Every structure is written in structure tokens, then in C-alpha cells.
Amino acid sequence: MRSCFPDVQSADPQIPAHLTRVGISGIKKLVKIPRRGKRSIVLVSTFNLFVDLPAHQKGIHMSRSHEVLQEVLEELEMSVEGSDTVIEDLCSRISRRLLERHDYATRSEVYMTGELILSRRTPVTKLPTQEPYKIIGRAVSKRTDNGIETRKMVGAEVVGLTACPCALEMMREHGKERVKHRLMEELDLEEEEAEDLAKKIVREDVHPMTHNQRGVGTILIEVSDVHRVSINDIIEIIEESMSAPTYELLKRPDELKVTCSACENPKFVEDCVREMIRRIVERFDYLPDDAVVIVRQVNKESIHKHDAFAERVTTMGELRKELGS
């Protein structure tokens, strides 16, 4: 039906300046991902949808973006296909259709986050627990002479536990000093003899206490239709790159195990990022050299009011050169 209302968005703007991204953000949607022979996965997801706006146009037609999102989600629900990497494909389909619907735009971008719940077992008591993981999809489409070209990324954000190596070593030395002075006072030993004995008592393989942080690790990897990356693999890499995993449920034996595991594997925020990098290069050796990789770690400090941050933005090729792979 032909609209009788004026198309204000297509009018000339007062200030003819090109805008890089215009759109709608924070759209909440239920995303039902069908899987062959398995129960569908339902994600509570948030979408950000953007297109660029030419200098000669006042505004974008925002309702078109919402219509595109709804159409693609309905098509996905009717589909019989599904895989671990479907979210970046979903973002790709949305971004391409945004350019088809917004014929004045030359670039579109889709960013999606969702919460994936995975079944786990506690480390000692083996009780069932459900653990939440934030999964991320992103796609950018550009209009070119050869048609629409799209680049897409998939990733995850995982919460874990880190233990501070610096405080751990300080506590070890502090423990040796306390034991040394106790030996000198109670056994009347000379300082050198007491120091040697204290070193044997406070052994290097005994890990003292240290302060902990709740770590948040993030990996985003560029993928293509040919090269796939499993979200489960990304989650595993992030989780194993911290001092210890966290759990929604912990009985006392489990709590002891997690605490000891963290102290036995202390890591700075920088260590976590470098460990993720090493595991990415090993696990995804089939990815092309030009695949973009973003690795980030934020540790929420327990003894400071600020957080610790480390990040690497690079390509698989650069990482292979650095690690000699």
C-alpha cells in the first residue's frame, strides 16, 4: 500500500556530513537455533544494527532495520540447519540484507551477544551445574564493484579466577622470615642455620596464599564460510588460560580444589592474554594468515579500586611469526 505520509528521512539535511554508523542498539530478541537431531538452542540475545548515512540524506529508515532482523530470525527458526558457529552466519545474513534494504548505504554492521548455558560438573563432588557464557557474533558488509562483501567474527567472553603471582612470592618470602625468626627464638639457632631450615620448611612446591581476581577473558576471531571456529573451543581456551575456572555451585571440597588450583597456577593479566594467544595458534592452525584475532583480559582487582587490563589485536600470521609456528 502506497504511503501518504512524507518521507522526511530522504530529505536533504541542513548540514551535509556523512555519518559512519546510524542505527538501533540494544534490541532484545529470542533467537531459536535449530539443530539436526537435537533440541533447539534458545538464546536471549541483544543486537546492534548500523548502516552508514550519505551526506545528502537526513536520516535512515530505522524501521527497515528492525524488519530485517525479524525476517532473518523467522527464517532461521524455520531452517533445519544449525551448528556451533551459526551466530556469525546469522549476523552476516542480517548485515547483507541491511544493505539490500537500505539502498543508499555503502556499509552495514551487526553486533550480537547472547548468553549460552553449558552443563558442567563441580571439580570434586561432580555435582551438575549450569554455567553461563557470553557469546559474540559480528559482521560488517560493504558495497563494492563486485557486489556485497562481508567479513564476520565469532567469539566469547568467559569469567574465571586469577591468582596474583607477585603477592604469592611475597607471602612465600614472608613465611620464610617468620619461620626463621621462630626457629631462632624457640630453638636458639643461629640466623644462617635457621634460614636454611626455614627454606626447607617453606618449600618452593608449597604454594602460599595470595589475593585473587575475577577475570573476564574475551576472544574474537575472524572467520569465513570455508574456515569455521567452534564457540565451545573458544570458551575452553579462555577458561583454561586463567588460574582456575569458576562455578555457580561449589561444595566445600570443590571450593578447596578451586582455591588450591588457582594458587598453584598464578597469573598476571598479561599471562592470561599470552596463554590465550598460544592456545589459539595451536588450536586454529587451519585459519589463514590474514584472519583478525582480538584477545582481551580484564581482571577485577580485589585489593585495588581499579581493574587490570591487557589486549592484543593482530592477525593469525603475525602470531605465527612471533611464536615461530
UniProtKB/Swiss-Prot annotation:
It catalyses: GTP + H2O = 7,8-dihydroneopterin 2',3'-cyclic phosphate + formate + diphosphate + H(+). Binds 1 Fe(2+) ion per subunit. GO terms for biological process: tetrahydromethanopterin biosynthetic process. GO terms for molecular function: GTP cyclohydrolase I activity; GTP cyclohydrolase IV activity; iron ion binding. Its EC number is 3.5.4.39. Its cofactor is Fe(2+). Pfam families: GCHY-1. The record marks C164 as: May be catalytically important. Pathway: Cofactor biosynthesis; 5,6,7,8-tetrahydromethanopterin biosynthesis. It is an enzyme of class 3 (hydrolase). Keywords: Hydrolase, Iron, Metal-binding. Homodimer. Converts GTP to 7,8-dihydro-D-neopterin 2',3'-cyclic phosphate, the first intermediate in the biosynthesis of coenzyme methanopterin. Belongs to the GTP cyclohydrolase IV family. This is GTP cyclohydrolase MptA. It comes from Methanopyrus kandleri (strain AV19 / DSM 6324 / JCM 9639 / NBRC 100938). The lineage of its organism: Archaea, Methanobacteriati, Methanobacteriota, Methanomada group, Methanopyri. The gene is mptA.
